[in-house]
Amino acid sequence: MITKDVKEQLIQVSGPENFDDSNAGRLVYSYDATPQYQSMPDAVIAPRNTDEISRILTICSEHRVPIVPRGSGTNLCGGTCPTEGGLVLLFKHMNQILEIDEENLTATVQPGVITLDMIRAVESKGLFYPPDPSSMKISTIGGNINENSGGLRGLKYGVTRDYVIGLEVVLANGDIIRTGGKLAKDVAGYDLTRLFVGSEGTLGIVTEAIVKLVPKPETKKTLLALYENIDAAAQTVSDIIAAKIIPATLEFLDQPTLLVIEDYAKIGLPTSAKAVLLIEQDGPFETVERDMEKIEAICKKGDAVSVQTAQTEEEAFALTEARRSALSALARLKPTTILEDATVPRSEIANMVKAINDIAAKYDISICTFGHAGDGNLHPTCTTDIRNKDEMERVEQAFAEIFEKAIELGGTITGEHGVGEMKAPYLEMKLKKEGIDAMKALKAAFDPRNILNPGKMFAKDARKRVVAER
């Protein structure tokens, strides 16, 4: 609850034009991309700089007002839903690329910068920022940092955490700290930079970031390998890595996903295949040619019924964009789409896909599976209808078993989507009580009044998913 006095203090900081507690204004920021989940904030505020954020947090801390930082709301874990009301903090005024440093190979950016805008800006300088979440046309760098976003290129290049080398962060009490910098080496104290990345706004508010860049790859090449057997496709993934080839992307799609994407994108995908591997390599011309020849041979030896190489950049782009459209394509099928990201060692891909299919059959639900096979990050996606309570109960039970299986195979409940509120009930399955207690101690140290994105990471009831009861 934001009292009249607190409202007046906040408006003094941001100006009345950047504070909104109208019903319409609050409604817009009551939900994110998480299926059928909504919670109203008490107000929305859009500060113009770090100093204003510091003053806002000082006020919120004094009056115990929850505050939820929000980028574009593309997360899939309820991470930016204001579950306990309070204040939603927007970064629409803090959306500048402050510097592209070609000598130190870094970019300094504000959190509201759209991911793809930054990628294009650095590419115009002959540089490359590899993390490429499927939401990059919409998502912000700040959101990527809070979720430690991955993407298709994670196998070769890593994820967001691997590129964030410095941060400006406002703590819960309003203090401003800087971590890291434009440095290749820095072991001064605890690695706070990596701690804040992926913390989902629960430890501090990121107001500026320094990210590492690399030279833009000279060229790239894409191929599509078709399989009549999912096990053969999964084994090919392991065989490629065992051959000491690390592709830029190594994506897996099962037949149900393939059918839906082709109906959506209409680019001539071969829908008769039981599984598809979409593989891209980048780098120097000679290296790409050599690697793709080897990859093609491995695919054929691994019982691929067809291996097709994109003949033009346009064709390669169409294939990659079709893969990125998977969620949009699946979302057309039924009113509710639940996309998860159970992740296993890549040697267990075949076992995990088989388990997902068996679990879907057991509970009589529809699950399409696709994902980043090269790093074991699968996206089992259920199309359903939240109004069908009986089916939703079966969906909940199915995903609980999928997460259990992932952990049994040496994996995790989330590879890149984050925990938020939706996956918090399952976190103890992965970390055990001792791990949760350690995280709670960190949270208490950074945010003793629990005002930073409360209700996220830590579940009130373990293994009771919120989506089933809303």
Swiss-Prot record:
What's the name of the protein?
Glycolate oxidase subunit GlcD
Write down the InterPro entries for this protein, in alphabetical order: FAD-bd_oxidored_4_C, FAD-bd_PCMH, FAD-bd_PCMH-like_sf, FAD-bd_PCMH_sub2, FAD-linked_Oxase-like_C, FAD-linked_OxidoTrans_Type4, GlcD, Oxid_FAD_bind_N
**Residues in FAD-binding PCMH-type domain copies:** 37-216
Q: Name one GO molecular function term.
A: (S)-2-hydroxy-acid oxidase activity
Q: Report the protein's function.
A: Component of a complex that catalyzes the oxidation of glycolate to glyoxylate. Is also able to oxidize D-lactate ((R)-lactate). Does not link directly to O(2), and 2,6-dichloroindophenol (DCIP) and phenazine methosulfate (PMS) can act as artificial electron acceptors in vitro, but the physiological molecule that functions as primary electron acceptor during glycolate oxidation is unknown.
Species this chain originates from:
Bacillus subtilis (strain 168)
Q: Which EC class does it fall in?
A: oxidoreductase
Cystine residue pairs: none
Superkingdom as given in the UniProt entry: Bacteria
Pfam families for this protein: FAD-oxidase_C, FAD_binding_4
Identify the SUPFAM superfamilies for this entry: FAD-binding/transporter-associated domain-like, FAD-linked oxidases, C-terminal domain
Q: EC?
A: 1.1.99.14
Q: Where in the cell is it found?
A: Cell membrane
Q: Which UniProt keywords apply?
A: Cell membrane, FAD, Flavoprotein, Membrane, Oxidoreductase
Looking up NCBIfam families in the UniProt record yields:
glcD (TIGR00387)
Q: How does it assemble?
A: The glycolate oxidase likely consists of several subunits including GlcD and GlcF.
Q: Which GO terms describe its cellular component?
A: glycolate oxidase complex; plasma membrane
- Is this entry keyworded 4Fe-4S? no
What cofactor does its activity depend on? FAD
Key word Membrane present in the record?
Answer: yes
Catalyzes what? glycolate + A = glyoxylate + AH2; (R)-lactate + A = pyruvate + AH2
Q: Which family does the record claim for this protein? A: Belongs to the FAD-binding oxidoreductase/transferase type 4 family.
